[in-house]
């Protein structure tokens, strides 16, 4: 009995440490470590779809309202992204205001529909009485063996697409 209890405790602790190593504490999303671990195990790139996201104006909210407000911005954005994308792939927080989703097979989802859902959720969030005007720049790329030598090339194309979207969204004026 005693030995079984010790084994159970060790197993629970190991699971907790694994979760702490893979999860972002603020958002509960998978973290950069998990992203690198998952992408290093990624054997089949053929139908891979990568979405990348960047939270616009986070620095403004941190500077004007404090880091608690910035943290709220990040957690609210993560909640929206999880709501839309979690059925399709893993959501990772890979930087302070950067997220991404890896989807194994782009044929299993409608990309334009997912982006439309993201914009609708942003609008619903922003229509409520909040101090934060949430704006999530979004880019994506589908693996193309003609142009992508590896996952890094796919990431670069997704980032370029996201930066184009970020420029389009920059017309936003602060409340």
Which residues make up each language-model segment?
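Short helix/loop segment flanking the catalytic signature motif in cyclic-nucleotide metabolism enzymes
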Residues: 73, 100-118
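Active-site-flanking beta-strand signature of metal-NTP-handling nucleotidyl enzymes
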Residues: 49-54, 91
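Active-site-proximal alpha-helical element of nucleotidyl cyclase-like catalytic domains
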Residues: 69-88
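Signal-transducing coiled-coil linker helices
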Residues: 1-25, 32-43, 47
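Catalytic-core segments of nucleotide cyclases and related cyclic-nucleotide turnover enzymes
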Residues: 112-119, 126-129, 143-174
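Conserved nucleotide-binding and Mg2+-coordinating catalytic segments in signaling enzymes
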Residues: 17-37, 53-67, 75
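Hydrophobic framework residues that shape the active-site pocket
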Residues: 58, 77, 99, 138
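A short pre-motif secondary-structure segment
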Residues: 90-93, 132
């Amino acid at each position: 009995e005693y030995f079984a209890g010790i084994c159970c405790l060790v197993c629970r602790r190991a699971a907790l440490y694994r979760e702490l190593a893979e999860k972002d504490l603020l958002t509960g999303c998978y973290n950069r470590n998990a992203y690198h671990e998952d992408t290093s195990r990624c054997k089949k790139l053929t139908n891979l779809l990568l979405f990348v996201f960047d939270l616009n104006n986070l620095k403004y909210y941190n500077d004007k309202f404090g880091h608690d407000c910035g943290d709220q911005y990040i957690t609210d954005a993560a909640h929206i992204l999880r709501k839309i994308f979690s059925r399709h792939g893993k959501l990772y927080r890979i930087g302070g205001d950067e997220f991404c989703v890896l989807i194994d097979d782009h044929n299993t989802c409608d990309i334009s529909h997912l982006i439309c859902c993201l914009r609708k959720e942003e609008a619903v969030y922003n229509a409520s009485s909040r101090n934060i005007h949430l704006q999530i720049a979004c880019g994506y790329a589908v693996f193309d063996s003609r142009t992508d030598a590896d996952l890094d090339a796919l990431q670069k194309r997704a980032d370029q697409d996201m930066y184009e979207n970020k420029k389009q969204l920059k017309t936003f004026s602060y409340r």
